């Protein structure tokens, strides 16, 4: 497992680098995160407006657990988004919840598809994880497409799961699994009909 002190954590991809956030990323973080369209597809943990105090709190680890691999997405030498998994605990320690966002400048150009593919492959191998899950707001079909293109399967919908300023929304549930064969127990297959 990575730690908050692991500043050397770098994952290279095609045209991008995933790395730990740094204090000198503050201006770039504010530039991309304060766009009013960015938080529309995210939970309200992602504030708008995104203030300097919000950025400082995030970079200091007061918003998310920086012991988890919360990485900056760097394109063209600047941080322009974030991607992370939050590993489960106890009996769920081999599964994790995936979250990500990228600045609007990079939307619609295939960046997140490549970034999610690279990051999830790295996380599943390195941590190790057998399941990575993501929830997608019903109004964010682009994010659902990113997941589907990276081997995620839509498992269902959590109805009326999230209250946003414009009303209640469903959350679509996606997962990518890669369990070792020795661990799989086909419980459902052996259950009486």
PLM regions: where:
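A short helix-loop-beta-strand connector motif used in the catalytic cores of GNAT acetyltransferases and
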Residues: 60-72
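Acyl-donor (CoA/ACP) binding surface of acyl/acetyltransferases
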Residues: 1-27, 31-37, 70-193
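Conserved GNAT-fold acetyl-CoA-binding loop/helix
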Residues: 37-60
């Amino acid at each position: 497992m990575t730690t908050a002190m692991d500043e050397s954590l770098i994952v290279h991809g095609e045209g991008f680098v995933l790395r730990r956030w740094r204090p000198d990323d503050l201006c770039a973080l504010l530039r991309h995160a304060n766009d009013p369209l960015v938080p529309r597809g995210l939970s309200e943990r992602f504030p708008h407006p995104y203030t300097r105090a919000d950025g400082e709190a995030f970079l200091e680890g007061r918003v998310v657990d920086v012991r988890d691999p919360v990485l900056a997405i760097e394109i063209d030498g600047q941080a322009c988004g974030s991607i992370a998994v939050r590993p489960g605990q106890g009996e769920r320690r081999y599964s994790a919840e995936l979250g990500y966002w990228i600045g609007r400048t990079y939307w619609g150009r295939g960046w997140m598809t490549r970034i999610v593919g690279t990051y999830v492959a790295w996380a599943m191998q390195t941590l190790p994880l057998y399941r990575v899950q993501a929830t997608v707001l019903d109004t964010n079909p682009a994010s659902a497409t990113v997941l589907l293109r990276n081997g995620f399967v839509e498992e269902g919908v959590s109805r009326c799961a999230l209250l946003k300023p414009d009303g209640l929304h469903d959350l679509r549930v996606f997962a990518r699994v890669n369990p070792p064969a020795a661990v799989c127990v086909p419980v459902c297959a052996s259950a009486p009909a």
